Design a protein with these regions (language model features):
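Terminal-appendage/accessory-domain detector
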Residues: 2-215
Length: 215
């Protein structure tokens, strides 16, 4: 409408898209894990993993929380969703993240995963805390630096300010990305025909008449 400022319309560009079904502070770390998955071929030889991040990430979803359930393979999905140690271990092994498969009991209890999981420790870094609270949307960061130390002493490092899907990330989410996410989340929940109909209608809302959306 005419009473809406252009700056208000642009505000949507400062929202934080979740590409992955996990706590938002985990988004950039999943992207980091995916990158490291392509670099490290011998995950079984990992000695330790150190994650340097913001106060919030360290104390809410990291080892700074001192919550033993975050290290428990039999913890609930709701708890694992807030365990960056678990999330990072699975994403590092799988090179991906799935809203269902990544949270199953069988997945959480995989021996190789538990080994990596237990090797992870988070640390608050004032640099990341400052970025986390930056009032400038273009500077505000939810990222981290990860250092993986192998048994032979070799180190792998990756750092990312914000998730790739973030409006200021490496590949900001576009319409096709949202549509793909919709298909992934509704797979086996609704038929492909219904998904196609729904997407067609919601992208044509301005031309729909009363009663057409639920036909």
């Amino acid at each position: 409408s005419s009473d809406v400022c252009s700056s208000d319309l642009k505000a949507i560009l400062e929202t934080y898209t979740k590409e992955y079904s996990a706590e938002y502070q985990a988004q950039a770390l999943i992207d980091i894990a995916k990158k490291l998955n392509k670099r490290i071929t011998d995950l079984k030889n990992i000695n330790k993993i150190d994650i340097y991040t913001s106060h919030h990430t360290h104390y809410v979803i990291g080892t700074g929380s001192n919550d033993p359930q975050k290290m428990d393979p039999n913890a609930s999905r709701e708890t694992l969703d807030h365990s960056i140690m678990y999330i990072f271990a699975v994403a590092l092994e799988d090179g991906n993240w799935h809203h269902v498969k990544s949270y199953t009991k069988a997945r959480a209890n995989r021996k190789s995963t538990i080994k990596i999981w237990k090797s992870i420790k988070t640390h608050e870094d004032k640099k990341w805390t400052k970025k986390y609270h930056d009032p400038d949307p273009k500077k505000k960061s939810f990222g981290a630096k990860v250092i993986i130390t192998m048994k032979n002493g070799k180190k792998y490092k990756e750092e990312l300010d914000r998730a790739d899907a973030h409006p200021y990330g490496a590949r900001p989410f576009k319409r096709e990305n949202y549509i793909n996410k919709f298909h992934i989340l509704t797979d086996k929940v609704i038929s492909k025909k219904e998904a196609k109909r729904f997407l067609k209608d919601v992208q044509n809302c301005k031309n729909l008449k009363n009663g057409q959306l639920d036909k």
